[in-house]
Amino acid sequence: MRCLTCLKLSFKPLCPNCLNDLPLSLKVRVLEGVSVYSFYAYSEIEELIKSKYALIGSRILPLLSQKAGKEFVRILQEKGLNIPLYGIAIDDKIKSFYSHSAALLKGFCQGNLKPTYGRLRANNAVSYAGKSLEFRANNPRDFTFRGDESLDYFLLDDIITTGTTLKEALKYLKTLNTKVHFAIALCSADE
């Protein structure tokens, strides 16, 4: 196999050098009173994040999320947040042979972060990719939660643009009295 970036021989779709060269740029936004952390600028990983639409994304996305997860676990440990936190990937339905959000969650969860799958599903399967804020507001996801409401959670999504999806998920989980400590987006498109 060859690295998709530099074309050198590699056991993974991104060689260690190219993965290390991708800069982490931690950003924090607050939505619904919850901190949302993003780790890459969309412009830096645009071609890689678009791999989510193809099967190769199942190999690329975990590499990106493992790198970000390693850094984030270090930050959590510095802040003394060592309790088990359970990750919820937003709408981790299988499309094109795998779930890109579940692949991200699996890669991100390290240390005290534990993945849970199939917990938060959208009843409205509309795609927000390239759509306006008005379209997003008029077509809510209408989430359903199938998890233990007594656990401590964090949310994960691939890209944060307007924050519409995360806001809706956070509002919905708040109505269920489900404790969400923070949310994570692999990259931020609000550059």
Region locations from a protein language model:
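Short cysteine-rich clusters marking metal-coordination/redox-active sites
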Residues: 3-6, 15-18
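Short functional micro-motifs and their immediate structural scaffolds
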Residues: 8-11, 23
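Active-site-facing substrate-recognition patch
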Residues: 16-86, 94, 120-150, 187-191
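A structural signal for isolated positions on well-ordered beta-strands in alpha/beta enzyme cores
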Residues: 86, 154, 181-184
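Glycine-rich phosphate-binding loops at beta-strand->alpha-helix junctions
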Residues: 89-101
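Histidine/lysine/aspartate-rich catalytic loop segments that bind and position anionic ligands
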Residues: 106-127
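A phosphate-binding catalytic loop at a beta-strand-loop-alpha-helix junction
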Residues: 155-169
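PRPP-dependent phosphoribosyltransferase catalytic core
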Residues: 167-191
